[in-house]
């Protein structure tokens, strides 16, 4: 039995969407990279990109044979969080539910600690 605690949850909905987006690409090594940058109305901002590189120190989480990659600097702000994919009246997007954020902006794409 594996008791290793995964610091971020990569939901089935997010993994399914990543899988559908990369199926049309000619690169089986693509993964979703989530990262934190300075900016946004609350001080920090979430970013998402597709990446086929895994750098030293990156955390990789697999779900449904697709990967989520987080760099060490961003990981410290995302521990305990969830990367999800939502569809609703305000559109469809990848979202981060972050228990470390003391406040978030209305659109949910930036936060403060």
Curated annotation (Swiss-Prot):
Keyword Cell division attributed: no
Superkingdom to which the source organism belongs: Bacteria
GO terms under biological process: iron-sulfur cluster assembly
UniProt cofactor note: Binds 1 iron-sulfur cluster per subunit.
Family: Belongs to the HesB/IscA family.
Protein's job: Required for insertion of 4Fe-4S clusters for at least IspG.
Subunit structure: Homodimer.
Identification of the protein by name: Iron-sulfur cluster insertion protein ErpA
Organism: Actinobacillus pleuropneumoniae serotype 7 (strain AP76)
Encoding gene (name): erpA
């Amino acid at each position: 039995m594996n008791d290793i605690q995964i610091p971020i949850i990569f939901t089935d909905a997010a993994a399914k969407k990543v899988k559908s987006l990369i199926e049309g690409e000619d690169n089986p090594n693509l993964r979703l990279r989530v990262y934190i940058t300075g900016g946004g109305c609350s001080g920090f901002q979430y970013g998402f990109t597709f990446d086929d590189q895994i750098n030293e120190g990156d955390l990789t989480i697999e779900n449904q044979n697709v990967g989520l990659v987080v760099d060490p600097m961003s990981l410290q702000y995302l521990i305990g969080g969830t990367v999800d994919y939502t569809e609703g009246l305000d559109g469809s997007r990848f979202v981060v539910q972050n228990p470390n954020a003391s406040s978030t902006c209305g659109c949910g794409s930036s936060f403060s600690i």
